[in-house]
Amino acid sequence: MAPLVFNDLQALKELVGREIGASEWFSVTPERVDCFAEATGDRQWIHLDHERASKESPYGGTIAHGFLTLSLISHLMKDVMEIRGGVRLAVNYGLNRVRFPAAVRTDSRVRALVTLLALKELPDCAEAIYAVTVEIDKSDKPGCVAEWIVRYYP
């Protein structure tokens, strides 16, 4: 699925309050979880020890770090939309209301559903707030929900 392309921020502004779209499904592999553990130093057994997690964890196996799931949002967003004009730089400004309603099991697939909540002009940039739900394939609960704040500089 190709991303929705906006020629400028004004075109994006027309979608305030509406769902923009969904990303492609993305596999959360054990190798990715291992790399994230190495990069962050978070080596809890629930993420890395498949045998122990199968026996002792309430999830029946290893799970992705919540922060790994959260960090995938910027990657998944590339599948959803692209702004081609009037923006030289997009900066991750922060997050609101981050929650992890369900664990993302290793080897499961996730995708992002994105809604534009707000887009406002600031003195030196524009600020967008997106509601992002990271869905887990074959799960009733999402792996992550968050409001993502992005600043766009001309």
Question: Positions of the model-derived regions?
Answer:
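Generic structural detector for well-ordered beta-strands
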Residues: 21, 25-27, 99, 149-151
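Predominant activation on well-ordered alpha-helical scaffold segments within soluble catalytic domains
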Residues: 34-37, 70-74
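Hydrophobic beta-strand-centered segment that forms part of the acyl-chain substrate-binding groove
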Residues: 57-64, 71-113
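Catalytic strand-loop segment that frames the active site of acyl-thioester-processing enzymes
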Residues: 2-64
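HotDog/MaoC-like acyl-thioester-processing domains
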Residues: 1-15, 100-154
